[in-house]
From Swiss-Prot:
InterPro entries: SurE, SurE-like_Pase/nucleotidase, SurE-like_sf. It comes from Hyphomonas neptunium (strain ATCC 15444). It is found in: Cytoplasm. This is 5'-nucleotidase SurE. The gene is surE. GO terms for cellular component: cytoplasm.
Length: 253
């Protein structure tokens, strides 16, 4: 099995090395194409207004001066001799659950792989109020292949991406794997921080504020809070089917 690895944290991110370890439990035909620099929060962006350059960093590995989607596109169209059988994106530094999925570069890369006809899985390591750099990567290492192998044994719809999140607990404290739906937080966690430079001009940092929600049972958030690995099937169709029917019936033509 030929596996393409990518991420949004960049070619030198520790999570990419973790992902490579996970992938080697499944195959020895591993290829890597990841952004040259961190691209967190870039969502499904592709570079249309400037050229994208690649830098070879290994026998089957490239750093791409673009977005996660750029990396997947170039790998599959130009850098690899044949299409991959599987795209793995991650392991992201921090969870990609609930509303995060809409702007996650990690999930976007997997979505792009799916769009190209390749089964794709996004993987993220939750980070609940830890100091930066102190993630429990051992949990991802221990549970990564355990989550991926059963998925590979089944056929899932071509328009579906699997979203895997590992809880912020030690490997031995993981309570198992749960199949979940996407949840929604009951509090906004994205915040802005206004500051002033030496010339008196305002500038802003955008980031996350650590807040716990009270998520419903069966959601990705609840699974992570409760110490489970969460697996959620996501798809690119954003149509709200129930309201589509209502809108059609109530629309005045």
């Amino acid at each position: 099995m030929r596996i393409l690895l990518t991420n949004d944290d960049g070619i030198n991110a520790p999570g990419l090395s973790v992902l490579e370890e996970i992938a080697k439990e499944i195959s020895d035909d591993i290829w890597i194409a990841a952004p040259e620099e961190e691209q967190s929060g870039k969502g499904r962006a592709i570079s249309l207004t400037h050229p994208v350059r690649v830098r070879k960093v290994g026998a089957k590995a490239w750093a791409v001066s673009g977005t996660p989607s750029d990396a997947v596109l170039l790998a599959t169209r130009d850098l690899m001799p044949d299409m991959p059988d599987l795209v793995l994106s991650g392991v992201n530094r921090g969870q990609n659950i609930a509303e995060d999925t809409s702007f996650s570069g990690t999930i976007a890369a997997a979505m792009f792989g799916m769009q190209l006809g390749v089964p794709s899985i996004a993987l993220s390591q939750a980070q609940n109020f830890r100091e930066r750099g102190s993630l429990s990567w051992e949990t991802s290492k221990a549970w990564g292949a355990k989550a991926i192998r059963p998925l590979l044994e089944m056929r899932w719809p071509k328009d579906v991406v699997m979203n895997v999140n590992f809880p912020d607990v030690e490997p031995g404290d993981v309570r198992g794997i749960q199949i979940t739906r996407q949840g929604f937080r009951d509090e906004a966690i994205i915040h802005t921080d206004r500051r002033e430079d030496l010339r008196g001009n305002d500038y802003y940092w955008i980031g996350y504020r650590g807040k716990l929600s009270k998520p419903d049972e069966g959601t990705d958030i609840r699974a992570i809070y409760d110490g489970y690995v969460s697996i959620s099937p996501l798809h690119v169709d954003l149509t709200h089917e129930p309201f589509l029917k209502t809108l059609k019936e109530s629309w005045q033509s």
